[in-house]
Amino acid sequence: MRSYTSAVDVATRRRASVRVAGPDARDHLQRLVSNDVDALQVGDACPALLLTAKARVIAPVVVWRRGEEDFLVLTEPELGETVRSLLVRMRLRAKCEIEPEEHESVLVFGGDVGFATDFPDAREALDAGLQPTVSDEELEARRVAAGVPRWGREIDDRVLPAEAGLEETHISFTKGCYPGQEPVARLHYRGHANRALRVLRLPAVPAYDAELVHDGKVVGRVTSAVPADGGALALAYVRTEVPDDAELAVG
């Protein structure tokens, strides 16, 4: 592996990785994930989702095309076996190998190393030999400020992609079929989500799952929060009918 010696900011990212390789690897992934794997050139990557038939999130992933027939699927550490077993179960007659791999992953802010990932203004690099300059706490603060949803906080098997703001980054509306495509497209073209993920500034750090109240009604819940400028920045799901500039009280 090539070793990089300079970067603006580097943060450790804990990952599980699954290799999918073989003559049918591209088609196999294209049939299962929400983004357009066919469009990836060698060296490119895209964030995507594995969804249930009802468009609930099974796992957020990043698909990296390492070679013509060699792909790496990256996900959260606790979801590695879930992703691997799903890819194996749905392989049917597809000619591809599906095996876990171990890598050290970092997020690189401001550099051009690595590949595109699901974190704004950052790229992801594997086994690059870079030393972290950003603590876990600072990375979490950057995540919340950027409105990036995280598995186990903003994303789980009850969440729709549109609610978490993942349509623009994780979904292609021009590719072929994949599990969950119909409800995703129906909501996108004909309806709207009842709640949406927002970044909020609050006077103090609230507890996880704290209620948000507007005009005497509970309109949302806090999913993540970090200290910021004497107060807090928080991610929360809020009812879409609540104006963006509405004052929300923590219940």
Sequence positions of predicted segments:
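Aromatic-anchored, glycine/proline-accented short structural segments
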Residues: 132-188
